[in-house]
Amino acid sequence: MEAHMDRLSLTGALLVATPLLEDPNFYRSVVFVIDDTPDEGTLGVILNRPSELGVGEVLAEWGEHVSQPAVMFAGGPVGQDAGLALAVPDDGQRPLGWKSLDAMDAKTWPNGLGTVDLDTPPQLVADALRQMRVFAGYAGWSAGQLRAEIDQGAWYVLPATVDDVFCADPRGLWSRVLRRQGGELAFVATFPHDPTLN
């Protein structure tokens, strides 16, 4: 996948931080790419940063409709005062307030994946959703910025699964994603947080 990185869209892929990435915003992060266009840049959300704050404490009407753990996730360092929701609808459903993401692989996402307008009354959309997660903020890169970071060895670009986006144990996601790749990346999953303690 990385050989043609400059012309392939990364929408729907995972960005998994390599051990070289020491920025505290992204240390051992797993980012799901929501949108990637050559002219406008890239937008994604960090999947493995659950907060202690319940969704119901911030968005009272949505609290009972989100996947477990039912907490707000820190989606990234940009726009942290705004919520962004990802959801998978039930079979054949395209509810009001749900917008499909472009370029989603039908094998991985047979029901689709999209965003939910959190201003939509939950009673109009929630019953048609299979899974939903709410993020405060997002990760963003200007045009060409993410490709440069990938070339510098900051990110692994890997395929995403539904379980990655909606996993019940998000804190262990970085290691799980790397382990399932096998080979060298499975070895990277065993790196200690502080290599000097090894």
From Swiss-Prot:
Q: Which HAMAP family match?
A: UPF0301
Protein's organism = Thermobifida fusca (strain YX)
Task: Report the protein name in the record.
Answer: UPF0301 protein Tfu_2389
| Stretches assigned to coiled coil | none
**InterPro entries referenced in this protein's UniProt entry, alphabetically:** AlgH-like (IPR003774)
Residues annotated as signal peptide:
none
Any Pfam family from its record, for instance, is: DUF179
Q: Which NCBIfam families match?
A: PRK00228.2-2 (NF001270)
